[in-house]
Curated annotation (Swiss-Prot):
Keywords: Ribonucleoprotein, Ribosomal protein, RNA-binding, rRNA-binding. One of its GO terms (molecular function) is structural constituent of ribosome. This protein binds to the 23S rRNA, and is important in its secondary structure. It is located near the subunit interface in the base of the L7/L12 stalk, and near the tRNA binding site of the peptidyltransferase center. It holds the Pfam family Ribosomal_L6. GO terms for cellular component: cytosolic large ribosomal subunit. InterPro entries: Ribosomal_uL6-like, Ribosomal_uL6-like_a/b-dom_sf, Ribosomal_uL6_a/b-dom, Ribosomal_uL6_bac-type, Ribosomal_uL6_CS. It comes from Synechococcus sp. (strain CC9902). Belongs to the universal ribosomal protein uL6 family. Part of the 50S ribosomal subunit. One of its GO terms (biological process) is cytoplasmic translation. This is Large ribosomal subunit protein uL6. Signal peptide: none annotated.
Length: 179
């Protein structure tokens, strides 16, 4: 049995969960999420907790047990508190701004790069160099933050580029030159 999967998921007071087979709908103060869990697990609601259990002892069922429990926990956390990921823009002349729901990044290219926000995601910019991606779906927030970082990944010599807040960039020494 999965060590993560065997723990029940607590449901806060302001969150409602409805189950329909393997489809889980979670509604909370920040919004509503729906997801179909993979085959091989069963989901049940007991009092203020959600319990995920494997349907058999097959390997695939045991593998999906912990995954399914974490997916449900992330959905509940998302509609209750939400998720956010911060990125820092390092480099002279590199900056970001928000126009409507579109993030516009000037990252050293000949043109500014525009990223429209998908449904459920909001971009916020502080001091022109700090971008905050927020939303209720953890997977979507992480994917959009990765797309922003991919515009100009940090380079190892001077560290210029877009990096996650708190990310450590491995630095390389430059050429040593002739002596």
């Amino acid at each position: 049995m999965s060590r993560i999967g065997k723990n029940p998921v607590p449901v806060p007071d302001k969150v409602t969960v409805s189950l329909d087979g393997l489809t889980v709908k979670v509604k909370g103060p920040k919004g509503e999420l729906e997801r179909t869990l993979p085959e091989g697990v069963s989901v049940s609601q007991e009092a203020n907790t959600i319990v995920v259990a494997p349907t058999s002892t097959k390997r695939i069922s045991r593998e999906r047990h912990g995954l399914s429990r974490t997916l449900v926990a992330n959905m509940i956390e998302g509609v209750h508190n939400g998720y956010s990921k911060a990125l820092e823009i390092v480099g002279v002349g590199s900056r970001a701004q928000v126009k409507g729901t579109t993030l516009v990044v000037s990252a050293g290219y000949s043109h500014p790069v525009e990223m429209p926000a998908p449904a459920g995601i909001t971009f916020k910019v502080e001091n022109n160099t700090r971008v905050i991606v927020s939303g209720i779906d953890k997977e979507l927030v992480g994917n959009e933050a990765a797309k922003v970082r991919a515009i100009r990944p940090p380079e190892p010599y001077k560290g210029k580029g877009i990096k996650y807040e708190g990310e450590h960039i491995l630095r390389k020494a430059g050429k040593s030159g002739k002596k």
